[in-house]
Amino acid sequence: MVESSQSIVQDAIDVAIGERGEIGVQVAAYLDSELVIDQWGGLSDETTGQEVDGDTLFPVFSNIKAMTATALHIQAERGLVDYYQPVAKYWPEFGKYGKDKGTVFDALTHRIGVPLMPVGVTPELMCDWDWMVGQIAEMHPLFEPGTRSGYMAYTFGWVVGEIVRRTDPMHRPFGQFIQEEICQPLGITDLWAGIPPEVEPRVAKLTNLPECPSRRSGNTSGLAAVPGLSAGGGDYPGGVWPF
C-alpha cells in the first residue's frame, strides 16, 4: 500500500511539473510518526539547474503564523503577556495614531488595523527586523482596532513577533526564540524564521510564471517590489480582506 501510494504521489508530481507549470515539488507524509511518503521532482533553482531532493527546504507561506502564535501563547502561559491588554503596554511605540487601544487579542485575530506592508519595503528591508517593526509602529490604522478584520498576510509575523520579543526577559531575536523555545524542544530541525547562511544553499528559489500573473488586485503598498509576492485582496481597496 505504501509503495503504491508513493508511486501515485510521484506520478502527480511528474504531471505537475511536466504539464501544470510547476518548477519543483516536494511531498512528505507521515503515518504514526513514520515517514511513508518522501517524493520530489523538478528544480530548486532554475538559474543553476539545481534539482530538488529530500533535503531541499521550501518557503511555505503562512505556516510561520502558527509558530508565531505559539510563541505568543508560550509567553501568555508564563504570565508575561495578557491577551486583553493593549499591544502598546508591551510595545509602547506601537500605540500611535489610534492604535493605542488595540489589544494582543486583536493582533492575534487580525483585527489590529495594520494589514498592509510598509511603503517602500524591499526584500532587504524585510530582513531588517528593527526597520520593519519601526515602520509598522508608525502606521496609521486602516480601521479602528478591534472593530473589523483585515487579514495580515505578511505583517502578522512582525506585529505578534515583536510582542514576543518585547516580553522575552532575554530579549532574544524572534528567530532565536522560535529555535530555542519551540524547534529544539520538539526536535524540529528544518524550520526557520530567518535562514542561517549555512542553510541558505538548501532553500528553493520561488519564481512567478510570467503567463500566470497574480489574479489579485488592490494596493500592493510596497510588496510589488518584492519578487514573488503580491499583496492584493480581491477587489477591496488597499488589499484588505474584510472578513
Region locations from a protein language model:
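Positions in alpha-helical segments
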Residues: 11, 70, 89, 158-162
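Short, conserved catalytic-motif segment at the N-terminal edge
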Residues: 2-60, 82-85
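Non-cleavable N-terminal signal-anchor transmembrane helices
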Residues: 30, 34, 41, 59, ...
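Short, well-structured active-site flanking segments
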Residues: 36, 67, 73-92, 167-195
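Short secondary-structure junction motifs
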Residues: 22-24, 78, 82-84, 136, ...
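Hydrophobic (often cysteine-bearing) scaffold residues that line and stabilize catalytic clefts
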Residues: 5, 9, 60, 64, ...
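Short, surface-exposed loop or secondary-structure junction motifs
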Residues: 45, 97-243
